């Protein structure tokens, strides 16, 4: 039984990673069709938030959280808005594979954060994996030097650190409870931040090509399922 749960957990993690990667890869199609990171990130927050609210309502699950947890979840929503916008901007600037490679340093960063704040130990295997991951990234950056943008790399680093923070802190809020209300609070705040940015700049860029719409819709769908 325990073995089955472990296998299921690994399968879920792999599946979520693949969905995120697919959603982020499709972002380039949306950009080529006329959209941009701000517009895409707004949709990637808003539609999953609406869908999750509907799911909770149909399930009869109150979406409320204790006050302290709610405040933390809303703060994580701001972090989520920042890291998602940074990731989608990195994908716009860098080759997709390189941007995603930088972003997927977040599991190592999550372990480091958990160890630094004293919530978990940092095992030697994680340290070794971190060294190998950063070595691989350094090699990739060296190989792709001609296509390298310092700004894009910084965006990718911000995205990885942001998701690491959200992963580390949200795990303490969720504990062994239902993660959906926490996720809803995070998505709701991220949606609000994105909408404010859209209103401030005064435009929302939708794709104007068929392939752009496929990329836009696919990115929203797959990233939403992953969340």
What positions do the PLM features span?
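Glycine-/small-residue-enriched transmembrane alpha-helix faces in small-molecule transporters
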Residues: 1-43, 78, 82, 86, ...
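Specific transmembrane alpha-helical segments of multi-pass solute transporters/efflux pumps
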Residues: 19-24, 53-99, 103, 109, ...
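Hydrophobic/aromatic residues within transmembrane alpha-helices
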Residues: 30, 40, 44, 90, ...
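Alpha-helical transmembrane segments of compact multi-pass small-molecule transporters, enriched
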Residues: 47-51, 102-116, 131-132, 189-196
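Hydrophobic transmembrane alpha-helices of multi-pass small-molecule transport proteins
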Residues: 52, 74, 78-80, 113, ...
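C-terminal ends of transmembrane helices
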Residues: 52-64, 108-122, 167-176, 227
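Loop-to-transmembrane alpha-helix entry segments
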Residues: 67-69, 100-103, 116-139, 146-153, ...
């Amino acid at each position: 039984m325990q073995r089955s749960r472990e296998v299921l957990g690994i399968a879920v993690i792999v599946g979520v990673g693949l969905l995120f990667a697919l959603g982020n890869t499709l972002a380039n199609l949306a950009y080529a069709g006329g959209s941009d990171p701000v517009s895409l990130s707004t949709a990637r927050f808003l539609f999953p938030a609406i869908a999750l609210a509907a799911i909770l309502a149909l399930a009869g699950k109150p979406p409320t959280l204790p006050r302290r947890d709610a405040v933390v979840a809303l703060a994580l929503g701001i972090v989520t808005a920042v890291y998602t916008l940074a990731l989608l901007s990195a994908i716009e600037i860098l080759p997709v594979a390189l941007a995603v490679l930088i972003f997927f340093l977040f599991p190592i960063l999550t372990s480091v954060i958990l160890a630094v704040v004293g919530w978990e130990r940092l095992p030697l295997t994680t340290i070794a994996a971190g060294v190998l991951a950063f070595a691989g990234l350094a090699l990739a950056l060296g190989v792709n030097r001609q296509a390298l943008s310092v700004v894009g790399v910084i965006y990718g680093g911000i995205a990885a650190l942001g998701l690491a923070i959200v992963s580390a802190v949200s795990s303490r809020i969720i504990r062994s409870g239902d993660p959906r209300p926490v996720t809803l609070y995070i998505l709701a705040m991220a949606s609000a931040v994105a909408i404010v940015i859209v209103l401030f700049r005064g435009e929302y860029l939708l794709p104007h090509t068929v392939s752009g719409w496929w990329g836009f819709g696919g990115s929203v769908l797959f990233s939403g399922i992953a969340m």
